[in-house]
Amino acid sequence: MKCPFCSHSETQVVETRISEDGDSIRRRRQCASCQKRFTTYERPDVAFPAIVKKDGRRIEYERAKLLASMTLALRKRPVSTEQVDGAVERIEEKLLMQGVRELPSARLGELVMRELKKLDKVAYVRFASVYRSFEDIDEFKTLVDEVRR
């Protein structure tokens, strides 16, 4: 594997670990030229369902996009990166378990809201307000009252 620092083609694996959930392998590598270390991850190459938007367009599922939307909702909230990664893993697991080639974006949004509700109620309200396109304060009030119960 090519070194990300100096582009040298020879690197050596110095440590290998299986993730806690057993779904990926983490490898620490060291460059033979510059001696710098870096981490790589190996995961099975699985096909996630295409996401069908409200307007009928089909787009590829993107982990980075999911992570970015959750991170935005969780901005300045006391939730660790590990907790967010765990939530994303659970969402992806559910996507794969659906066993379908296409999934409505609404279903993905519901999965995200369910995970955010477990992680942080404020982040849940933030995400839901954008996802459900709240137009007035009463919609916020209804959701906040629901979360408080």
Swiss-Prot record:
The keyword Transmembrane helix does not apply. PROSITE patterns: ATP_CONE. Keywords: ATP-binding, DNA-binding, Metal-binding, Nucleotide-binding, Repressor, Transcription, Transcription regulation, Zinc, Zinc-finger. Pfam families: ATP-cone, Zn_ribbon_NrdR. Residues 49-139 form the ATP-cone domain. GO terms for biological process: negative regulation of DNA-templated transcription. Its cofactor is Zn(2+). The keyword Disulfide bond does not apply. Binds 1 zinc ion. A zinc finger (unnamed) spans 3-34. Transmembrane segments: none annotated. One of its GO terms (molecular function) is ATP binding. InterPro entries: ATP-cone_dom (IPR005144), NrdR-like_N (IPR055173), RNR_NrdR-like (IPR003796). Belongs to the NrdR family. Negatively regulates transcription of bacterial ribonucleotide reductase nrd genes and operons by binding to NrdR-boxes. This is Transcriptional repressor NrdR. It comes from Albidiferax ferrireducens (strain ATCC BAA-621 / DSM 15236 / T118).
